């Protein structure tokens, strides 16, 4: 598996063994992958590189806007993966900023996303640090995702008192109670989650040029964050 091989390689990249102490597997972002055939910054030719020089693909096409649109060309998606340690019964996302996971590919001289080469027309670095690290701190990421996970846990808790009561009433009234309560009761946890995501975007993220995509749009398979398309240093200056 390329990820584990790169993690164990010696040189500029470093990372722990994927099996901590030989027993417990370490977590890494399952969405990222490595490529060894790419064009380095400042070069014109695509060539093969060693695994230790591989680019780490950490951002992806924005599937939430029409392909070929201006927004599609100017934005990318960073994905925070699902985690299953706490429960298999409700969605839960990684609270780690991509590049800070226990088994992430790291470079000692990098604290933020550092472009190294081009692949498929986009710029990538050689570590697991995604461009999101240029906009959000690890602490901010952790706080926001923990709140999102909290809403999801409550929404999918089948043994909660409210769920048990509503299910019993629905059976007895042929779902009439749910139809009536939908007009009067407070918003559901999933609706509150949508409100929270919108609030975070409006108050904090949109001024930085990024935004959280509603988890509902990804079917809760990943927590997707839209970022500006990364550009090489020469294009920024």
From Swiss-Prot:
Chief site of localization: endoplasmic reticulum
Membrane topology: Peripheral membrane protein
Keyword Lipoprotein: no
Signal peptide, first to last residue: none
Pfam families, A to Z: Erf4
Alphabetical GO biological process terms: protein targeting to membrane
Record's keyword terms, sorted: Endoplasmic reticulum, Membrane
Single GO MF descriptor: palmitoyltransferase activity
GO CC aspect terms: endoplasmic reticulum membrane; endoplasmic reticulum palmitoyltransferase complex
Keyword Endoplasmic reticulum: yes
Location(s) in or outside the cell: Endoplasmic reticulum membrane
PANTHER family in UniProt: GOLGI AUTOANTIGEN, GOLGIN SUBFAMILY A, 7, GOLGIN SUBFAMILY A MEMBER 7_ERF4 DOMAIN-CONTAINING PROTEIN
Protein's job: The ERF2-ERF4 complex is a palmitoyltransferase specific for Ras proteins. Palmitoylates RAS2, which is required for its proper plasma membrane localization.
Record text on subunit structure and interactions: Interacts with ERF2.
Recorded family membership: Belongs to the ERF4 family.
Designated name of the protein: Ras modification protein ERF4
Origin species: Eremothecium gossypii (strain ATCC 10895 / CBS 109.51 / FGSC 9923 / NRRL Y-1056) (Yeast)
């Amino acid at each position: 598996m390329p990820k584990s091989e790169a993690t164990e390689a010696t040189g500029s990249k470093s990372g722990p063994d994927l099996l901590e102490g030989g027993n417990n597997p370490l977590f890494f972002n399952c969405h990222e992958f490595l490529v060894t055939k790419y064009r380095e910054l400042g070069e014109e030719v695509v060539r093969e590189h060693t695994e230790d020089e591989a680019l780490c693909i950490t951002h992806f096409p924005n599937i939430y806007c029409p392909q070929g649109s201006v927004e599609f060309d100017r934005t990318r998606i960073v994905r925070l993966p699902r985690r299953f340690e706490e429960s298999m019964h409700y969605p839960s996302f990684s609270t780690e900023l991509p590049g800070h996971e226990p088994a992430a590919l790291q470079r000692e001289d990098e604290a933020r996303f550092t472009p190294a080469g081009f692949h498929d027309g986009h710029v990538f670095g050689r570590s697991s640090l995604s461009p999101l690290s240029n906009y959000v701190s690890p602490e901010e990421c952790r706080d926001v995702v923990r709140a999102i996970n909290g809403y999801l846990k409550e929404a999918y808790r089948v043994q909660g008192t409210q769920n048990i009561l509503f299910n019993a009433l629905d059976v007895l009234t042929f779902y009439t109670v749910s139809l009536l309560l939908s007009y009067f009761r407070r918003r559901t946890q999933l609706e509150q989650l949508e409100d929270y995501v919108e609030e975070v975007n409006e108050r904090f993220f949109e001024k930085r040029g990024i935004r959280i995509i509603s988890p509902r749009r990804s079917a809760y398979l990943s927590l997707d964050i839209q970022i500006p398309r990364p550009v090489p240093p020469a294009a920024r200056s």
